[in-house]
Amino acid sequence: KIMNIRDIKRKKITEMTTDEILAERKFYEDVIANCKYEKPQDIADLFEAYTMLIWKHKQVGRVYDFYFDGLKEERDGGDNLEGSDHVVLDTLRALARTPDLNVVFEEIHCIGNPKDGFRFGQVVWNDATTVDGVGPDGPGSGLGYEDREDLEMCECWIRKIDGKWRVAKEASIRSNAAYKRVLG
């Protein structure tokens, strides 16, 4: 049976069958493997694929495939990150607290070209609970986000660095009240 990837995309990984998980993962892996880096839509699709593999499918090591080691990520509230190692650490911390996290893309728009690089903006919301999570203060609270309560917006600059396309800079803002309510 051929699956429609759009039907399973919004499901949390904990709600998916093994066949659905493997089909979705293969879909995103194919997007990455076949990216031509020629048009803005190529980059938008690529970033969505990386995001879903890193966050939903817990392939955190893929950060090293796409993020520049000298990355600077500017966040609202001043909790900035520098370097891909810090992005990995921050991602692992978040996933430990919300193991059922699912990122839902509302919109992603990209501009640019292969000569000058690309720039995109995206809006996502997170669907997650802390029921099975563990944080610095122990077991999770069991709280979860309401639909579209934890909105995140980010803008990324993609450049060719040492012959490879990488996220060179990222700026992000999120719904801090929801984040603090659920994660403390």
Give the positions of each predicted feature.
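Short, low-complexity N-terminal intrinsically disordered segments enriched in polar/charged residues
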Residues: 2-61, 65-69
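A compositionally biased, intrinsically disordered/low-complexity signal enriched
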Residues: 3, 54-56, 60, 64, ...
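A beta-strand edge to alpha-helix "cap/lid" segment located at domain peripheries
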Residues: 4-34, 92-184
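Soluble or luminal CAZymes and related metallo-dependent hydrolases
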Residues: 42, 86, 149-150
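A solvent-exposed, acidic/Ser-Thr-rich amphipathic alpha-helical stretch
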Residues: 45, 60-123
